[in-house]
Amino acid sequence: MPPKFKRHLNDDDVTGSVKSERRNLLEDDSDEEEDFFLRGPSGPRFGPRNDKIKHVQNQVDEVIDVMQENITKVIERGERLDELQDKSESLSDNATAFSNRSKQLRRQMWWRGCKIKAIMALAAAILLLMIIILIVVKFRT
């Protein structure tokens, strides 16, 4: 046998029900066993709470969407930062290679200049020596 409940309900207990249900269920003389099923969540208590819950759930869903967008943006930003870091490392390596190559080229050009100056000096010395030999041979004879 189910537990016994009060037979007469307050208006607050039945405000969410349809009038015909109330009339049929509460006015008919029923067994005590049937009264067991009359109790349940009432309309006005759940109505505003349900709306508040839906409102809060909508806000939670919006926050979740915003957080997912933010996480996606952070991941994309991280990928872009990785690409930027790779490019900067490549640029740094290229700058170092350019600096080393320019120093090497500068040395090569300096040695080339030294060789040209040495050849010019040797040519001038040979020419001067030939002139001196010609003058000496001319005066001796």
Swiss-Prot record:
<comment type="subunit">
    <text>Identified in a complex containing STX6, STX12, VAMP4 and VTI1A. Interacts with BAIAP3; this interaction is increased in the presence of calcium.</text>
</comment>
<protein>
    <recommendedName>
        <fullName>Vesicle-associated membrane protein 4</fullName>
    </recommendedName>
</protein>
<keyword id="KW-0472">Membrane</keyword>
<dbReference type="GO" id="GO:0098887">
    <property type="term" value="P:neurotransmitter receptor transport, endosome to postsynaptic membrane"/>
</dbReference>
<keyword id="KW-1133">Transmembrane helix</keyword>
<dbReference type="GO" id="GO:0005802">
    <property type="term" value="C:trans-Golgi network"/>
</dbReference>
<dbReference type="GO" id="GO:0009986">
    <property type="term" value="C:cell surface"/>
</dbReference>
<keyword id="KW-0175">Coiled coil</keyword>
<dbReference type="GO" id="GO:1900242">
    <property type="term" value="P:regulation of synaptic vesicle endocytosis"/>
</dbReference>
<dbReference type="GO" id="GO:0090161">
    <property type="term" value="P:Golgi ribbon formation"/>
</dbReference>
<comment type="function">
    <text>Involved in the pathway that functions to remove an inhibitor (probably synaptotagmin-4) of calcium-triggered exocytosis during the maturation of secretory granules. May be a marker for this sorting pathway that is critical for remodeling the secretory response of granule.</text>
</comment>
<feature type="domain" description="v-SNARE coiled-coil homology">
    <location>
        <begin position="52"/>
        <end position="112"/>
    </location>
</feature>
<dbReference type="GO" id="GO:0071346">
    <property type="term" value="P:cellular response to type II interferon"/>
</dbReference>
<dbReference type="GO" id="GO:0031201">
    <property type="term" value="C:SNARE complex"/>
</dbReference>
<dbReference type="GO" id="GO:0035493">
    <property type="term" value="P:SNARE complex assembly"/>
</dbReference>
<dbReference type="InterPro" id="IPR042887">
    <property type="entry name" value="VAMP4"/>
</dbReference>
<dbReference type="GO" id="GO:0098954">
    <property type="term" value="C:presynaptic endosome membrane"/>
</dbReference>
<dbReference type="GO" id="GO:0016189">
    <property type="term" value="P:synaptic vesicle to endosome fusion"/>
</dbReference>
<dbReference type="GO" id="GO:0045335">
    <property type="term" value="C:phagocytic vesicle"/>
</dbReference>
<dbReference type="Pfam" id="PF00957">
    <property type="entry name" value="Synaptobrevin"/>
</dbReference>
<dbReference type="GO" id="GO:0099003">
    <property type="term" value="P:vesicle-mediated transport in synapse"/>
</dbReference>
<dbReference type="GO" id="GO:0042996">
    <property type="term" value="P:regulation of Golgi to plasma membrane protein transport"/>
</dbReference>
<feature type="region of interest" description="Disordered">
    <location>
        <begin position="1"/>
        <end position="51"/>
    </location>
</feature>
<dbReference type="GO" id="GO:0043001">
    <property type="term" value="P:Golgi to plasma membrane protein transport"/>
</dbReference>
<feature type="site" description="(Microbial infection) Cleavage; by C.botulinum neurotoxin type X (BoNT/X)">
    <location>
        <begin position="87"/>
        <end position="88"/>
    </location>
</feature>
<keyword id="KW-0597">Phosphoprotein</keyword>
<keyword id="KW-0812">Transmembrane</keyword>
<comment type="similarity">
    <text>Belongs to the synaptobrevin family.</text>
</comment>
<feature type="topological domain" description="Cytoplasmic">
    <location>
        <begin position="1"/>
        <end position="118"/>
    </location>
</feature>
<feature type="modified residue" description="Phosphoserine">
    <location>
        <position position="17"/>
    </location>
</feature>
<dbReference type="GO" id="GO:0005794">
    <property type="term" value="C:Golgi apparatus"/>
</dbReference>
<dbReference type="InterPro" id="IPR042855">
    <property type="entry name" value="V_SNARE_CC"/>
</dbReference>
<feature type="modified residue" description="Phosphoserine">
    <location>
        <position position="30"/>
    </location>
</feature>
<dbReference type="GO" id="GO:0098978">
    <property type="term" value="C:glutamatergic synapse"/>
</dbReference>
<feature type="topological domain" description="Vesicular">
    <location>
        <begin position="140"/>
        <end position="141"/>
    </location>
</feature>
<feature type="transmembrane region" description="Helical; Anchor for type IV membrane protein">
    <location>
        <begin position="119"/>
        <end position="139"/>
    </location>
</feature>
<keyword id="KW-0333">Golgi apparatus</keyword>
<dbReference type="InterPro" id="IPR001388">
    <property type="entry name" value="Synaptobrevin-like"/>
</dbReference>
